[in-house]
Amino acid sequence: MGDMIEFTSKQRKALEKLAHDLQPVVIVGGAGVTEGVVDMIDNSLNAHELIKVKFNEYKDEKKELITEVCQQLDASLVRIIGNVAILFRPAPEEEDRKISY
């Protein structure tokens, strides 16, 4: 696994702007961050690179949970706004990347 990306404030702002109109693609509910949820996040990152994950439950633990998921999936946390986390992971192949950072 590689390292999570450390964004400059300019890069972070650009990614936040791109994520603004996105709807959450994964919702964390009563079961918490299960293997199925992690798989959904992984598949969504493969398809979109930039996604939102909404926490309907476990709101107090969201920072720790999403940090753990990012480490598992080699993704980067852009920002948490309210109960929504914005995650980014570039496509492994440069020619497949939709977002430059």
Question: What are the residue ranges of the model-derived segments?
Answer:
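Positively charged, polar, low-complexity stretches
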Residues: 2-101
